[in-house]
Regions:
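HotDog/MaoC-like acyl-thioester-processing domains
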Residues: 1-13, 99-150
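Hot-dog-fold acyl-thioester-processing enzymes
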Residues: 2-87
Length: 150
């Protein structure tokens, strides 16, 4: 379910949990496609037989997990009056647990700050990628974006 707010009121959400995404399964196909796109073909990700033998199965790339943030966050916050938004960067990223192929992940998002910047509003979000059935998250990232209103 999406949280709704007007562009002028987005700062009222600071300190609040924005929402939790649906679960998404990490498939070997997704891992292989990420390996192709990035050139990262390390065996722990793409050599299923060796990974099964040596580490209990293949794991997703940390950066694949991180790259899911825009997809998992889509629809969590609907800011009325926004004409465009851009990714601005990250302050902190930590990979705290590996995601095994076949597991499901979701994102929990909290708005940490909303500050005027370059004619827009810079949003700082804490994005926690959770693994179904695991206590420790896969990734915790503090992301920055800038939204512009009409």
């Amino acid at each position: 379910m999406s949280k709704e707010v007007a562009y002028a009121d987005v700062a009222t959400l600071v300190g609040q949990e924005i929402g939790v995404s649906d679960w998404v399964q990490i498939t070997q196909e997704r891992v292989n496609q990420f390996a192709e796109a990035t050139g990262d073909h390390q065996w722990i990700h793409v050599d299923v037989e060796r990974a099964n033998r040596e580490i209990g199965g293949p794991i997703a790339h940390g950066y694949l997990t991180l790259s899911l943030i825009p997809f998992l966050g889509a629809g969590l916050l609907n800011v009325h009056g926004v004409t465009r938004g851009i990714n601005y960067g990250s302050n902190k990223v930590r990979f705290t647990n590996m995601v095994r192929v076949g597991k499901r992940v979701r994102m929990r998002q909290k708005l940490l700050a909303a500050e005027a910047k370059s004619g827009g509003v810079q949003l700082t979000n804490e994005c926690t990628i959770e693994i179904e059935g695991e206590e420790r998250p896969a990734c915790v990232a503090e992301t920055l974006s800038v939204i512009y209103g009409s």
